[in-house]
Structures are given as structure tokens and as C-alpha cells.
């Protein structure tokens, strides 16, 4: 009984904290108040600690990793979003937009788990024999980590598309490189007349108030690429470990279960994104559109099967 009471306390504290942190980060986008952004970062760390305590507490009284039902997977997804934020914050000089993306992600998944799911779905139960496998735990944890990173990366791409509307792509992703080259190679014969005119346009543009917007777009593009690259790797590991586990449990590596089919679709979408970035050299709008599509594909893969209530991966939600 004490474990359940402690879980409820930690769930309410962590949700209240992440709600406040979300409001703080959204506020920093409007008002540049000194110290407000750092308060959001500290709040995210406390939220991470509370959610960690909740998951450990549930692990202790259930006797297994808290990854066995939809409630636990949502809480783990919220925890993963806070981990992702903390890791990126260490390397980011301006975390306002980072927090404005990761904090709402953690809040919405946490809120849906605690407020949106029926109480009977929040209870922990005994694992069936097929789930009592180390491959099972590796598979589920890697997949949920990949969901968190892919969703955050896709949200960064969606934010990029919104901010980038009405801004010339070539100006954003070509200006800095051209100006840098001009500074390093100031030979007058190096540039044609048209090139010099182009550089002048870039210089005028970067002298305007749009400079910060360009910087933000490039930063969002960088975050999206890094997050999706990490999420794609985690998704690959999770899918391969799931195939090994499925072969041990059911004698088949791949059975075209609905979630397996959507896993392949998800993997393909983000493989296309990474291909366009690494081999085609695309930046900005084109790969961001692919990543934005991936955002919806991930949610279909994660919740679509549960809404339908079919397949081996269904948690049974909304089943008659």
C-alpha cells in the first residue's frame, strides 16, 4: 500500500513540475527574463528525479521493469524525454527552444498516462511467460527511447518549418558559408560579379533583424538531425532485439504483425530523412518535411495498434 501511495505522490509532483517547466520555457520565448531559462533547466532535472523515483518504486513492488503496459510505457516515454533534454542542454548555449519542445512532450505523455488512461490500465500486473525475457526488456526500452528522440527531433523539424515560412532557404543555409569563404579568401578575382552581388545580399540580410531567426533555424535543423540520427540507431537496435526475442518466444523473427509493419514504415521514413541529409546534402525544408511526416508515423505505430486492439503488441485498450 505504501508503494502505491508513494507512486501517486511522485506522479502528482512530477506532473505539476513539468507543467510549470513547460510554462517557464514558453514564457522565455516571449520575455527574455534573466535566470528564467535556468530555472526551467533545474525544474526539468527535479522532474527527471521524481519520475525516476516513480519508475524505481513501481519496479520494486511489481518485481519487473515498468514496461509491461501502456501506462508504464507512457511514463517511461516521459522520463526519456527529460533525459534527452538534460543531455542536450549540456551542449546547448540557448536552451529556450529546446525546452519549449522537450518539456511539452514530457508533460503531455505524463499527463495522458496519469489523467487520460483508465485506473485499471494503470495497475501493474504479472508478466506472462513470453515477456519474461532479457531480450524483451532490451527491445521495449530501446524502442521507447527511440520514440522520445524521434518525436523530439520531428517536433524540431515542425518548428523549423513554421519559423522558416517566408524565409529564403538559400539565404539561411548559404549565407554564413559564403561570408566565411569571403573572409578567408578575399581575392577579388575569386568571385564573379554575380557572386559579389549575392554576397552583398547575404550581408544586408544578416545585418537585419532576421539574423537571430537564421541562427534559430540552423540550430533547430542541427537538433533535429542529431536527435533523429540517435533515434534511428535506437530504433534499429530495438527492432533487431525484438526480432531475436520473437524467435525465442514464438519461433519466428518477423510475422508482419501490425506494429511490426508500422515499425518497418517508421524505419524507412527516417532512413529516407538521413539519406537526404548525409548523401544528398539537403538541409532545412526538404528533410524537415520528411521528419514531420515521421512524427505522425511514430504516433500511429505507438498508439494505432492499441486503438485497434489487435496484434501481439496490443495492450488491449478499447477492446470490447
Curated annotation (Swiss-Prot):
Protein name per the record: Cytochrome c biogenesis protein CcsA
Matches recorded under InterPro entries: Cyt_c_assembly, Cyt_c_biogenesis_CcsA, Cyt_c_biogenesis_CcsA/CcmC
Sorted UniProt keywords: Chloroplast, Cytochrome c-type biogenesis, Membrane, Plastid, Thylakoid, Transmembrane, Transmembrane helix
Record function comment: Required during biogenesis of c-type cytochromes (cytochrome c6 and cytochrome f) at the step of heme attachment.
GO molecular function: heme binding
GO biological process: cytochrome complex assembly
Residues annotated as transmembrane: 9-29, 36-56, 70-90, 97-117, 143-163, 227-247, 254-274, 288-308
The organism of origin for this protein: Pinus thunbergii
Membrane topology: Multi-pass membrane protein
Similarity comment: family membership: Belongs to the CcmF/CycK/Ccl1/NrfE/CcsA family.
Pfam family of the protein (one): Cytochrom_C_asm
Subunit structure: May interact with Ccs1.
